[in-house]
Amino acid sequence: MWRGLWTLAAQAARGPRRLCTRRSSGAPAPGSGATIFALSSGQGRCGIAVIRTSGPASGHALRILTAPRDLPLARHASLRLLSDPRSGEPLDRALVLWFPGPQSFTGEDCVEFHVHGGPAVVSGVLQALGSVPGLRPAEAGEFTRRAFANGKLNLTEVEGLADLIHAETEAQRRQALRQLDGELGHLCRGWAETLTKALAHVEAYIDFGEDDNLEEGVLEQADIEVRALQVALGAHLRDARRGQRLRSGVHVVVTGPPNAGKSSLVNLLSRKPVSIVSPEPGTTRDVLETPVDLAGFPVLLSDTAGLREGVGPVEQEGVRRARERLEQADLILAMLDASDLASPSSCNFLATVVASVGAQSPSDSSQRLLLVLNKSDLLSPEGPGPGPDLPPHLLLSCLTGEGLDGLLEALRKELAAVCGDPSTDPPLLTRARHQHHLQGCLDALGHYKQSKDLALAAEALRVARGHLTRLTGGGGTEEILDIIFQDFCVGK
């Protein structure tokens, strides 16, 4: 239905367009003079729908659609009757807000129409706006693209806005909001200023090296600034994987011998019946994955086949896939039957999977492991019976839920260690583009340190500074901008 409504509005302006699409090559570039309009709120029936415009004809559109005709007080809500400028027919009684540029989201004159969210109302207002000369439907992400073009947002802030729109967990929301607030951009600008000062010192020495009036230690000061920046860049690059996990999700793999309760735990954590639970060993024969929100962190939870040998070819393929997922896991939930710790399968699992991951130091591997002893409801008050020596572990009963709170708290701590704390940690690198430019900057600083020729050293500093400038959007190519803005839909 909504695509049909949008098509009607588009046809009234300049021919049909899709509701959510990449910017076409023929679309006017931001700042071309066209005024754009779009439905900015969600699709479907709702109490209030928000329709916005941006561009020089926004004030004109507001005047001819409303009564009285004068513009309302800037940035104050005003109740107005909306009418179709072609027929004079009333469309809705709505709240309108007038945002004269440059004090607006896009930096241009903007209007917001807060109308009743019925399809007929929204359709009527969109068609009315499409009939106003100089107005056309917005392309995907065009409002934000204009904000970027007009200097209201830098590129990292644009990416933060996209991440905020798509955030599904508390941690993702916090990280996206910090990036939207400009923390990563401010950090990069500070680094760029450091490089500018270092470059000024080097070029001063090149131009006035034999001048008695030149301060002593100019090159040494540049070296100190570069070394400090190398340390800072290296620290952020080491943390890059944490930011990518926070944006894309932490891979948590549940593994263990058959019938340890792996599928029951996956169902418990995901709060829905993802996996089939059966007392028959080998029920799970493939990897089942489900995205979940655990303690505010995004997680891709994988249920895997029980690890054992000497089974049929189908289950053996499931075991192979389970071991493959184990190698890819960020966090392993190792499950054992607390009432059967002395069995060969339990002892073998402890000696192989648990021991091998536990032997790794955090500096050698990003993998972490929690050992969970399930079926605690079958234990005597004294706890687990005779068996192998156990590393630190958690007791849980998937049947009764006893021990679940302790497991969730342990998971929260592990996920915070894997992803970082988006509330207090330094700004994280959430995209491969960020990592690429910081690595390029670090490589260029390495060339600076190795250069015997001061002219080549100065050029290396320029290259390093260029990477930081491009990270925040300076000198970015249209292709890169198109990739970033394709994450937005019409109206944003």
Swiss-Prot record:
Its main location: mitochondrion. GO terms for cellular component: cytoplasm; mitochondrion; nucleus; transferase complex. It catalyses: GTP + H2O = GDP + phosphate + H(+). Keywords: Cardiomyopathy, Cytoplasm, Disease variant, GTP-binding, Hydrolase, Mitochondrion, Nucleotide-binding, Primary mitochondrial disease, Transit peptide, tRNA processing. Its cofactor is K(+). Residues 1-20 form a transit peptide. Changing A322P: Decreased GTPase catalytic efficiency. 5,10-methylenetetrahydrofolate binds at R52, E112, K152, K492. GTP binds at residues 256-263, 282-286, 303-306, 374-377, 397-399. Forms a homodimer in the presence of potassium. InterPro entries: G_TrmE (IPR031168), GTP-bd (IPR006073), GTP-bd_TrmE_N (IPR018948), GTPase_MnmE (IPR004520), MnmE_dom2 (IPR027368), MnmE_helical (IPR025867), P-loop_NTPase (IPR027417), Small_GTP-bd (IPR005225). Residues 249-416 form the TrmE-type G domain. Coiled coil: none annotated. Mg(2+) binds at S263, T284. Ubiquitously expressed. Gene3D superfamilies: P-loop containing nucleotide triphosphate hydrolases, Probable tRNA modification gtpase trme, domain 1, tRNA modification GTPase MnmE domain 2. GO terms for biological process: mitochondrial tRNA wobble uridine modification; tRNA methylation; tRNA wobble uridine modification. The keyword Lyase does not apply. NCBIfam families: PRK05291.1-3 (NF003661), small_GTP (TIGR00231). Homodimer; forms a dimer in the presence of potassium. Interacts with MTO1; forms the GTPBP3-MTO1 complex composed of homodimers of GTPBP3 and MTO1. GTPase component of the GTPBP3-MTO1 complex that catalyzes the 5-taurinomethyluridine (taum(5)U) modification at the 34th wobble position (U34) of mitochondrial tRNAs (mt-tRNAs), which plays a role in mt-tRNA decoding and mitochondrial translation. Taum(5)U formation on mammalian mt-tRNA requires the presence of both GTPBP3-mediated GTPase activity and MTO1 catalytic activity. Belongs to the TRAFAC class TrmE-Era-EngA-EngB-Septin-like GTPase superfamily. TrmE GTPase family. This is 5-taurinomethyluridine-[tRNA] synthase subunit GTPB3, mitochondrial. It comes from Homo sapiens (Human). The gene is GTPBP3.
